[in-house]
């Protein structure tokens, strides 16, 4: 969904990847993912598009909060400088060739003249294009990953090629510095056959299923244990399979409370525990699971007493920076065993699942503008309810769109940098899925 960092921004100054024998009707795809160290980072992967020798890896958002897959076409323009909808404004830049794809240079490409337009973050980002391309996508593994090849390639994947974007950002008259913008997005939300403009395609996951490259409409994401330093977090994404070594305890099914017209996976709000104090959120909302968002948003009604209770119960460890949560100390000083714990009710009566997210995983390099240098600004805010990349770093999220199943487990247990483990891999044939309680 790529939620805009409105509050935070104001403060900022396969072919198969394993050599394993499985029955012939079973197929799966493994994609390495990362949560880079950076204030606006989301869950991403590195992809080379096409077969041109001059192709460069491009860091693309893997977004459970949107449905469509796109990349920049060569010569694309990004416009900004106006706060008004569909007004390109006075400023623009050309997307560098190193982060664009030119199908004319790839012997494996096939293009079609199809128009596309995608809207993100409450109409603050609009991208447009008039070309689709089918080509080979090569996903680059982490150089420290174990039990995987260095790359995995999938042929004949369809993407929209975008040639322009409008960012609703005011400018100070200089058009400098240029804003950050997405280099590409692979939407991962469920495929819904409809004419809705929110789900117009191409659908990465549905196209893989339709081509029988995977036999089940499952997706599982995980992150490994965090490194000792504040840096990139590594993980993986499996389509059509699960790696049972990536979580502790059972996968617990939770209710997917998505409503008609919504895109993505929605769950009921959890209870939130910090410093031994459990709080029951008071905002009337459901919560979006959105790997394409840089932060988590806690469902405390901003004008109620609950935000103050949250900060007061932290024992002085957390401070309120205009709705953004800060740690009262340097980022490096955050204890490694200090967690935010989210307790979700299960789909089955009496079942619950607790997800521990290390507070250090929220420290992604955001800086206060004119604030206290002794405060570490976190990718964590109060109001609304979205669980973005930080939440994903502490959870295993498993979905089966065929059955409407959404399940959670405790993640962050496998070795930093590790890929999928062949010995713990379960690949799904037709009609199969993961175990859950």
Write out the residue ranges for each language-model feature:
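Aspartic protease catalytic domain
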Residues: 339-437
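Short hydrophobic beta-strand that contains or immediately precedes a catalytic carboxylate
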Residues: 47-49, 55-63, 69-71, 186, ...
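Solvent-exposed loop/turn segments at secondary-structure junctions
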Residues: 64-69, 75-78, 166-167, 192-193, ...
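Aspartyl protease catalytic domain
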Residues: 18-39, 143, 147-280, 284
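Pepsin-like aspartyl protease folds
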Residues: 18-57, 118-131, 168, 245-283, ...
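Fungal secretory targeting signals
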Residues: 1-25, 437
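Signature of the N-terminal lobe/flap region of pepsin-like aspartyl proteases
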Residues: 38-172, 341
């Amino acid at each position: 969904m790529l939620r805009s960092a409105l509050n935070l921004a104001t403060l900022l100054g396969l072919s198969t990847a394993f050599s394993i024998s499985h029955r012939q009707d079973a197929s799966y795809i493994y994609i390495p993912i990362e949560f880079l160290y950076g204030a606006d980072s989301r869950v991403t992967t590195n992809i080379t598009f096409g077969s041109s020798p001059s192709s460069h890896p491009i860091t693309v958002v893997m977004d459970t909060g949107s449905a469509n897959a796109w990349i920049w076409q060569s010569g694309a323009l990004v416009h900004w400088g106006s706060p008004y909808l569909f007004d390109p404004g006075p400023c623009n830049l050309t997307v560098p060739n190193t982060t664009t794809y030119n199908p004319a240079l790839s012997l494996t490409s096939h293009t079609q003249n199809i128009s596309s337009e995608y809207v993100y973050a409450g109409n603050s980002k609009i991208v447009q294009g008039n070309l689709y391309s089918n080509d080979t996508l090569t996903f680059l593994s982490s150089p420290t990953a174990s039990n995987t090849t260095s790359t995995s390639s999938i042929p004949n994947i369809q993407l929209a090629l975008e040639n322009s974007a409008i960012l609703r950002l005011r400018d100070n008259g200089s058009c400098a510095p240029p804003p950050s913008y997405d280099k590409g997005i692979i939407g991962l939300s469920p495929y819904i056959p409809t004419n809705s403009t929110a789900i117009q395609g191409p659908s990465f996951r549905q196209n893989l299923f339709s081509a029988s490259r995977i036999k089940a409409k499952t997706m599982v994401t995980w992150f490994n244990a965090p490194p000792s330093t504040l840096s990139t977090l590594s993980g993986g994404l499996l389509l059509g399979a699960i790696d049972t070594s990536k979580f502790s305890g059972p996968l617990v099914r939770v209710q997917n409370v998505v409503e008609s017209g919504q895109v993505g996976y929605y769950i009921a709000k959890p209870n939130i525990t910090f410093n031994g104090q459990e709080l029951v959120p008071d905002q009337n909302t459901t919560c979006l699971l959105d790997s394409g968002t840089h932060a988590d948003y806690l469902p405390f009604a901003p004008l109620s007493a609950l935000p103050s209770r949250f900060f007061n119960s932290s024992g002085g460890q957390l401070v309120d920076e205009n709705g953004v949560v800060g740690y009262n100390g340097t980022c490096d000083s955050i204890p490694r065993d200090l967690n935010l714990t989210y307790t979700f009710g299960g789909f089955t009566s009496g079942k619950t699942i607790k997800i521990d997210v290390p507070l250090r995983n929220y420290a992604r390099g955001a800086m206060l503008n004119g604030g206290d240098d002794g405060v570490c600004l976190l990718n964590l805010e109060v109001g609304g309810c979205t669980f973005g990349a930080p939440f994903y770093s502490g959870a295993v999220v498993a979905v089966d769109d065929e059955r409407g199943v959404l399940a959670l487990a405790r993640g962050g247990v496998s070795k930093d940098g590790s890929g999928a483990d062949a010995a713990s891999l379960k690949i799904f044939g037709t009609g199969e899925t993961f175990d859950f309680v």
